[in-house]
């Protein structure tokens, strides 16, 4: 092959390569709005890294009725990670009452006070009991009729490895006004979860909105200061998490208008850890719409 043909081949290859590389769009919106979303995203990253964030979960262990010994030794009913004492103690589950008894020679703390025998409150009571030894923290969760130990390690390696979550370019066009359509009475909707079970929840109404000339509707769940929405769309399993994303909104205004800002839609905790118990979108909240806003997939899960 002569030199001129080689040069033509190189130029053609470069042209094809450059034309296949799409430049990501610049943020779209007022400077104030763009700054607001950037600040929201930064705070989201900070929350994930906290001791109470989702990044440091290292275990989820379901309890059986009766005694449940736990620690790093294989002789326990529940094996904790190797950086824990061989036997930490025992959790006794009897008729929904949970009691902790520590093993001899192990310092277990509750609110920085050493405890040897303590009644435990689960996470649904609003006054959950958290215990600690070394860098480990654990408490009881209740899901359906089951109780489990949720374990954290505040020195988990992922805290150092985690840097950020990719997001779509901020676009104020994805800040959409929806109409709240109340259900009277509130409708019971089925919410599946990652554990393979389904629970009922009250939906006070649906949120109806228009995008690209088409109408869409999402069933909302009541939250403390507005609504909580679990949804999936045509990016799910491709660019975003396959099991959907979460979105919070404010309460409806006097005209029953609710703002859906998909730029702050975010990944469920199951993206970051297999030890979370995430709800999944109800089937009616799967949208035939590509929502290119908010958080993208993190890691290798889809």
Residue ranges of predicted features:
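Bacterial N-terminal signal peptides that target proteins for export
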Residues: 1-8
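C-terminal motif of bacterial Sec signal peptides marking the signal peptidase cleavage site
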Residues: 16-19
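Bacterial signal peptide processing site
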Residues: 21-23
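N-terminal beta-hairpin/loop module of FHA
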Residues: 32, 36-84, 234-235
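Forkhead-associated
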Residues: 63-128
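Surface-exposed beta-loop interaction hotspot
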Residues: 132-199
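Extended, aromatic/histidine-rich regions of cofactor-dependent oxidoreductases associated
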Residues: 161-167, 236-238, 257-259, 263-302
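Flexible, glycine-rich surface segments
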Residues: 177-236, 241
């Amino acid at each position: 092959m002569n030199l001129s043909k080689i040069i033509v081949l190189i130029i053609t290859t470069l042209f094809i390569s450059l034309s296949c590389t799409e430049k990501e769009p610049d943020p779209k919106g007022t400077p104030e709005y763009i700054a607001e979303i950037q600040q929201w995203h930064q705070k989201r990253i900070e929350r994930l890294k906290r001791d109470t964030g989702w990044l440091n979960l290292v275990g989820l262990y379901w309890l059986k009725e009766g005694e449940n010994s736990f620690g790093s030794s294989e002789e326990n009913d529940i094996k904790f990670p190797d950086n824990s004492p061989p036997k930490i103690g025992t959790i006794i589950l009897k008729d929904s009452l949970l009691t902790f008894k520590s093993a001899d020679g192990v310092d277990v703390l509750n609110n920085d006070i050493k405890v040897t025998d303590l009644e435990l409150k689960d996470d649904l009571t609003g006054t959950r009991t958290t215990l600690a030894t070394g860098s480990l923290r654990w408490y009881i969760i209740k899901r359906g009729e089951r109780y489990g130990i949720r374990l954290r390690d505040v020195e988990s390696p992922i805290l150092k490895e985690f840097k950020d979550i990719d997001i779509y370019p901020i676009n104020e066009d994805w800040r959409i006004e929806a109409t709240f359509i109340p259900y009277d009475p509130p409708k019971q909707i089925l919410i599946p979860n990652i554990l393979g079970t389904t629970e009922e929840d009250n939906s006070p109404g649906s949120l109806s909105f228009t995008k690209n000339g088409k109408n869409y509707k999402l069933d909302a769940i009541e939250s403390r200061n507005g609504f909580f929405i679990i949804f999936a769309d045509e990016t799910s399993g491709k660019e975003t998490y396959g099991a959907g994303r979460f979105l919070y909104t404010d309460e409806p205004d006097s005209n029953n208008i609710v703002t859906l800002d998909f730029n702050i839609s975010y990944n469920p905790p199951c993206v970051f850890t297999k030890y979370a118990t995430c709800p999944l979108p109800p089937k009616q909240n799967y949208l035939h719409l590509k929502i290119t806003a908010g958080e993208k997939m993190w890691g290798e899960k889809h």
